[in-house]
Amino acid sequence: MSSDKKTPMPAEAALGDIGRHATGSATSREAGGQVLRSRAWFNNPANIDMTALYLERYLNYGLTREELQSGKPIIGIAQTGSDLSPCNRHHLVLAERVREGIRTAGGIAIEFPVHPIQETSKRPTAALDRNLAYLGLVEVLYGYPLDGVVLTIGCDKTTPACLMAAATVNIPAIALSVGPMLNGWYKGQRTGSGTIVWKARELLAAGEIDQTGFIDMVASSSTSTGYCNTMGTATTMNSLAESLGMQLPGSAAIPAPYRERQQIAYETGKRIVEMVAEDLKPSDIMTKDAFINTIRVNSAIGGSTNAPIHVNAIARHVGVDLTVEEWQTYGHDIPLLVNLQPAGEYLGEDYFRAGGVPAVVAQLMKQGLIKENALTANGKTIGENCRNATIENPAVIKTFEEPIKKRAGFVVLKGNLFDSAVMKTSVISEEFRQRYLSDPKDPEAFEGRAIIFDGPEDYHKRIDDPALAIDAHCILVIRGVGPIGYPGAAEVVNMRPPAYLIKQGISALACIGDGRQSGTSGSPSILNASPEAAANGGLALLKTGDRIRVDLRKGTADALVSSSEWEKRRQDLAASGGYRYPGHQTPWQEIQRGMIDQMAEGMVLKPAVAYQDIAHTKGMPRDNH
């Protein structure tokens, strides 16, 4: 997987003398030397009956034999937008501009659907569908006559699903973000999608708004087509797709309704044809250097705790060794530069107008924190793309010297509760710090009495039960919500305190869980715990009333239970058949539970990571007749 820079080649020159046929003595090659895969389907004189069979059904909606046998590259548009996926629905419009770009550059566009993933409507969790969409897209990219692909990304899980599949197959690929929604407003204040939900829950629990007011407040943030306008998982992953090099520079932050979004869709369509000519593949772009850059960018933008899961999954599928511990190694000491909710004040439109990802990268470059030679989708290095980028609004994007917070990266914790878990330090509020982290003798550590909930249903049923005697220093623990237990790892770790504490002005308690939380949440939870309770991890042994000690400086989280008692609990759990969780409801739930890895390893399907660069290592798929 070379990271050497490739010189961009005009598509019309590179593709000028190709297309005779894909097998035999005269192979279909362009000036760069690679074979266009699609010729094996559409122009194979050595097997004319199969050529005819492959051709004829693509003619029935208006494509011509001349086009399909012209030697022009066939470019897929992996369409993630649909009525079921409102965050990505605008891609149905953008795809027309992508088509025009592909045709302008000398390619032929073929659009196809990707399994829908909508964060806010899929039960039991959209994370269950990331690997399913990945599998389907791998089969399409490998098994159909495609020479390159435009990946339409946006809502949380669509981005990693698409990049994972592109990494596995390893044909030329470029990503196009759908873009964030326009800014939300409620009574003169910015309301960020997702983030406002957690604030509205507090107000509802405190009795300050009724149910109608709750819905009105939440809906105020959903202003237009596009994904969450906060620095949630969607904006995070789209920004990181750019820092990885898989999007055109400056494209991630463009709001969905802006004219620039349609323009970049056209440019993306043009560029993928050139990438096919240059044979510029995901493995050339997504190198270890690109992943190190991405970890640092994630810290600087205040990115979601879902990022380590998804980025590590992408790395595993492209064959790059990346551990959860490296998120602390490379990212912990990076300052917070982007002032977006939930860690800050502003929203997506402001992020774009302030300079987006290039402005952030430029600040990190000045400190020598970016691997500048990492190649990107436009054929240039990230250094070339971002060196002259400027901050256009210093209220939204800060300089490295005057950040919002000096350290914004994740702390990776371990102990007898789990082998690894992640805490997002950029969202630790002053109120939380004063209550949990203000002991001058031990300023980065806290202890608390554990209150255990087995799943969100148990939590919602009992959180306001006075018999639990939850106070301002308790630690809420939720388990059974991981990749196996839920299944899919639910976004439920950011638990609100009991209503009586909210009325006292306590808006957040320390939370620990083997699930995830929305990237739009401002809760400084300890989450992504691996192994999960359903894999008989340490959280399965915990009991309500146990005391937990968390030390951020040492990176530890432990139940203060004797080793002999802990071992006895482990033996008792094994004797009882292990931690119990709900049964399978669908065939896919059973399949995924049997194959899925833990969150620290990217929550990938374990057998799938053995399949890498399959377009080149596995040969052509066999004929179908």
Give the predicted meaning of each segment.
Residues 141-162, 173-178:
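A short, small-residue-rich loop immediately preceding and capping a beta-strand
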Residues 91:
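Glycine-rich beta-alpha loop segments
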Residues 2-87, 96-114, 120, 126, ...:
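Catalytic or ion-coupling anion/metal-binding cores of large enzyme and transporter domains
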Residues 111-144:
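N-terminal small/polar loop signature for handling phosphorylated ligands or for N-terminal nucleophile
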